[in-house]
Amino acid sequence: MMLAIEKLSVSYGGLAALRGVSVAVEEGQFVAIVGPNGAGKTTLFKAISGVVPAGSGAITYEGRNLLAIPPYERVHLGIAHVPEGRQVFAALTVLENLEMGAYSSRGRTTWHRNIERIFALFPVLAERRRQLAGTLSGGEQQMLAIGRGIASSPRLLLLDEPSMGLAPAIADLIFDRIAALHREDGVTLILVEQRVAEALESCDYGYVLETGQVVLEGTHTALTANDRVRRAYLGM
């Protein structure tokens, strides 16, 4: 098991954001986590990457107690978090943003290979490598945010709402590139996404979070056939 989250609870000022959440991710798996706004999906990612502290429960990554490891060291273990809202460094160029993603020892030793892969996945970034990130379109900034994650040479890549605010055609392109990264590179992916149909279609296994709890889980086939999922999230 690459990642095991067991009975994880997280609170903000006494307000419970996650309540006893358990998630299991095998190496090479593509896992989707879906649910409404405020369900705790982003909080789950922040707990994995160490941005917010866990109140109780456990997170184990490749046999290590992740909660005992400082956030800045988790990237060295091969965990990369592509945050909601892209959060690129607007005043830096595209190439400088990618270099920032490669600051870890993993990223530095594989920089040349990774940059070639990033530019193969997102050719527009190669064309605009000297352009300031703040002048890119929303879709291009999302490509850059994903590329910055890839630059760290991750074994586990957390993708938080990569389609947020994007035109449908651009969101479709982003999903296609994410699927290619998983299929061709074997990177273990956890995707948080509100475009539920696309997320469940792409994943091997999925979880539905509501009000900070896992209410459903299963293969993409099982979840897309589930009446509750079809009514609440797929409009069927």
Language-model segment annotations:
Residues G13, I69, V94-R113, L121-A126, ...:
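ABC-type ATPase nucleotide-binding domains, specifically the catalytic core motifs of the NBD
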Residues D172-G186:
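Helical segment within the ABC ATPase nucleotide-binding domain
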Residues L132-L136, E140:
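Conserved ABC ATPase signature
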Residues G57-N65, L77, W111-I115:
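Conserved ABC transporter NBD signature motif
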Residues S49:
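Helix-to-loop junction immediately C-terminal to a conserved catalytic motif
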